[in-house]
Amino acid sequence: DGVIAYSFEDSVYVQFTNGETVRIARGGNALSTLSFMTDGRLMALSGNKFIAIDLSNGTREELLSWEFSDEPKAVEPPKDYIAEQQQSLVEYIKLQRKNRQEKDDAQKALAKENSSVAPTPFYFDKSHRLAGISVSPAGNFAVVATTESKPTRDDSDIMPHYIQEDSRIAAKPVRQRVADAESVNHELWLLNLKTGEKSELKYFNLPGYNDDVLADVKAENAKAKGETYEVNRLPRDITLLQSWYWTKPSIRWHKNGNAVAVMLEAWDNKDRWIATVDLANKTLENQHRLHDDAWVNYRFNAFDWLNDSETLYYQSEHTGYSHLYVQKPGEKPVALTSGRFIVDDLTLSSDDNYIYFKANMEHPGLYEVYRADLS
């Protein structure tokens, strides 16, 4: 509606349609990942929580928070036979446990029904860390990716730096060698912010999720040794796609908050999937698979929703060239471009009539701006 929110240094500003600019935050817990919700409030990430800010009066509401720890329990089960007997035979112990459990149940019920109480945090494996999170503009769901928390480098990832003020040689930490990188997997979760339910989104619906993509090479190597290779059908490690063109997670909500798509990649870089989330059944639904026996490009991966229709638009190189497609979930994609050229830098018009893009139609080294007519 023309309202703009932005951050500068330690402050967050909102510019209204009348031209007035108001600072709504300065210092304290930094606000980032700014976006507008369907009800006009400003949503922001603050530490390990998302909040919603009412721009008319400045009030804030916590939408969700998360912790990587064991969920606190009002009562713990007995650890052995002696503890079991103690808890079942001693009336005082039984009463104390009963009271703690009832108090905990009442507090959780109050948090669900009373907006005066902050929602209960979502708890994840304490050995994991956050890999990505995105909240629906409607404030009713969130998609979260977590991964095992482990160091990405060690003391050997160093490089000599010769130019120093003291004329000595300094050892600088650098990225690890490619050969030292270990496989990474993301667990994907759907959070229902209204009910507090947490559901894992399994990858079983992704075609090829357990393909042994190097089976031919491994079989050839085994044959040379006089051995036989048995095809491996274990699930591959899969993550949110890490693009060279954006830093936010590869999770895209439609602006109405009722549809969400994710872009996933296999750790071996042979497959990329665009999938939507069935919010009712809590499952992933594959919409497009891009496979490359060599390597899926880190470019040409733009994807998003049209503004006024739950229709995806995206880039794909499955023909060998990066081209532009639109697709209603569950239907076949429609190619908007084709030929021996590449399409990049997509921009959707606000009225959904055009997608502007850059392409080298006339010559591989000559890029010009074009538009695809969606009307």
Language-model region placement:
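Beta-propeller folds
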Residues: D1-S375
